[in-house]
Amino acid sequence: MPPKKPEPKKETAKVAAAPAPAPAPAPEPLRDSAFDPKSVKIDFSADQIEEFKEAFSLFDRTPTGEMKITYGQCGDVLRALGQNPTNAEVLRVLGKPKPEEMNSKTLDFEMFLPILQHISRNKEQGTYEDFVEGLRVFDKESNGTVMGAELRHVLATLGEKMSEAEVEQLLTGQEDANGCINYEAFVKHVMSG
């Protein structure tokens, strides 16, 4: 009788019993560089600063007019001064506060001015071509139009969400009889103010 071959189960058991090599350490996630208001050089003129201060004061809800706004008002003040930061940008320059801090934490004008300077320097405005290309994705028939209902849904639910009233204001008079919107004409309309 020939000698028995070793059973593969034993070899498998030996392989399984061998210590597994240590997993490679996970790469450290990239961290957002924190916004440092002290590092921002203010380039505004004295007249501009006075104008900004006046607008800022309109948002001040403190009982004694302390020239303070809540974190939640910061984006509104920036937009009132002609900037268009995303909500994410506003949260980043505020140090990513918790949602419950947005209406309790405040900042004064001296803290706000570097934020305004930073946001005004770092505008990333899309071009006409960028917006047309973005809307072309929704042009299923490649005829230069998008469905108004679909555009309404996208504007109200994706990215920087708009309210239904804002969407209606934006799209008033843009749809044809079939409920379609010529997106090149729409982008020209939006970019003209």
Swiss-Prot record:
A Gene Ontology BP annotation from the UniProt entry: cardiac muscle contraction
Basic and acidic residues bias (residue ranges): 1-13
Keywords: Methylation, Motor protein, Muscle protein, Myosin, Repeat
Modified sites of kind N,N-dimethylproline: 2
Region (Disordered): 1-36
GO-annotated molecular function: actin filament binding; actin monomer binding; calcium ion binding
InterPro entries per the UniProt record, alphabetical: CALM/Myosin/TropC-like, EF-hand-dom_pair, EF_hand_dom
Positions of the EF-hand domain: 47-84, 126-161
Top-level taxon of origin: Eukaryota
GO cellular component, one term: A band
Role of this protein: Regulatory light chain of myosin. Does not bind calcium.
Complexes and interactors: Myosin is a hexamer of 2 heavy chains and 4 light chains.
Protein name according to UniProt: Myosin light chain 4
Lineage: Eukaryota, Metazoa, Chordata, Craniata, Vertebrata
